């Protein structure tokens, strides 16, 4: 995640109508706290795809400056939300033998990588690999298999991809605003995290 200074998290949401920049930190109880907000009108995007670079860059800069001034933090890198008609999703699965009859982190990573190794259109790139559930020797619904005993480990995943061109143009706008895009997150996924983790 994009953290500057003492665990500062900075998020950037570039939408069709507005750009929103949020700066957050953690309080003493480790709860996320918003300390800076910047918003500006955006006219350079159409359905999640950049249609005009210069106006998008200007909007990002204004939103960034407002958030930086409110929070008192310099904004150098961000987590960026991404969405649009170019987003695609696929389901995949795979199965591997469990060495030494106990699931290791390597086993878990291997089966996920195998499930994600599928043919996707050449103009798309992987955005998220989301494990839905694991199974061991046919026992389904396992959320965390590491450390469990068994012979065969399987996984079902949900693969989310985005247009490489759309992401590159979005990245160009961010970089031209003198910011590094550390990470891209599908906007509905980011929304689900906020609902499930912070309520």
Please tell me what each predicted stretch does.
Residues 1-18, 22-197:
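Nucleotide/phosphate-binding catalytic cleft detector across ATP-hydrolyzing
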């Amino acid at each position: 995640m994009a953290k500057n200074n003492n665990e500062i998290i900075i998020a950037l949401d570039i939408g069709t109508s507005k750009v929103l920049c949020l700066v957050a930190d953690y309080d003493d109880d480790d709860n996320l706290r918003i300390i800076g907000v910047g918003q500006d009108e955006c006219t350079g995007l159409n359905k999640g795809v950049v249609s005009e670079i210069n106006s998008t860059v200007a909007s990002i800069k204004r939103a960034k400056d407002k958030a930086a001034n409110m929070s008192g933090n310099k904004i150098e890198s961000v987590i960026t939300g991404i969405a649009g008609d170019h987003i695609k999703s696929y389901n995949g699965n795979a199965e591997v033998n469990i060495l030494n009859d106990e699931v290791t982190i390597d086993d878990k990573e291997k089966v996920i990588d195998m499930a994600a190794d599928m043919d996707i259109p050449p103009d798309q790139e992987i955005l998220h690999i989301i494990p839905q559930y694991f199974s061991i020797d046919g026992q389904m619904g396992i959320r965390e298999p590491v450390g469990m005993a068994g012979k065969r480990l399987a996984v079902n995943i949900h693969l989310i991809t985005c247009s490489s061109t759309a992401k590159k143009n979005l990245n160009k706008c961010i970089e031209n605003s003198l910011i590094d895009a550390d990470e891209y997150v599908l906007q509905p996924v980011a929304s689900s995290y906020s609902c499930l983790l912070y309520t």
